[in-house]
Amino acid sequence: TCALPILFKELDSRARNVKKEDLEEFKKQIFWVYGYIDSIATPTKTSVTKIKELENEDDAIVSLEELSNKQEFKQEIAKPKFLNEEQKISSAQKGTLMHLCFQRLDESKNYTMEQIKEFVQNLVNRDIITKQESDAINITKLYEYTKSNLWQELKNAKEVHKEQPFYINLKSQDVYGNSSNDNILVQGIIDLYYINSKGEIILVDYKTDRINNGEEQKLIEKYSKQLEIYQKALEQSLQKNVSRKYIYSVTLGKEIMI
């Protein structure tokens, strides 16, 4: 311990003799900040769902991208009945069930309400969904969909493509709004696109958000970036421009142009 005062005195002496330019260089090295911090903070691969979560962290977002990974639509060993009875179907699960129905409805048919009920029951009979899940499906909204302008467009379309997966390279700044010029790989699934009788490509995304008439702008603002990414991916894949893109609002039972 007796040596400590001598050591401190020596260190103090050396510190006083440090050149100013050496001190400045030392500060630069100690407090150096990487100039491309956005690049290392940005993932090289992401999904449209993740992008939406960043923009709307409090929103329950449902799309066919999530549907493709849902375990409840894959055959598994049946759970005990008492467990199934205790489970409740969440709003997100209800949205996923509606997406599943839209995917499987036959656009060449003119469904009656009774036929829609039979369609849902058939999903149960084929073990695609459970009885409890079928009870959570809004039959009226499915029927409204088959009477919508969109449904009539699909009936007359040259081609109809559902649940189309895609990958696309985009600039990080276009996705996250940061300063990075790096490319990131974005993956997702397009709910629906079709080619109409005029040869135009129409892009559609189903949304189950609860909104009122007159609040369509909320959906447009919330999902415009998502559909912009879908449009870029589709145009890159088909080498042809998308003529129009729509949100189909399940709640309102109509298409909303973006």
Task: For the regions a language model picked out, list residue spans one by one.
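Structural signature of nuclease core domains in nucleic-acid processing machines
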Residues: T1-I258
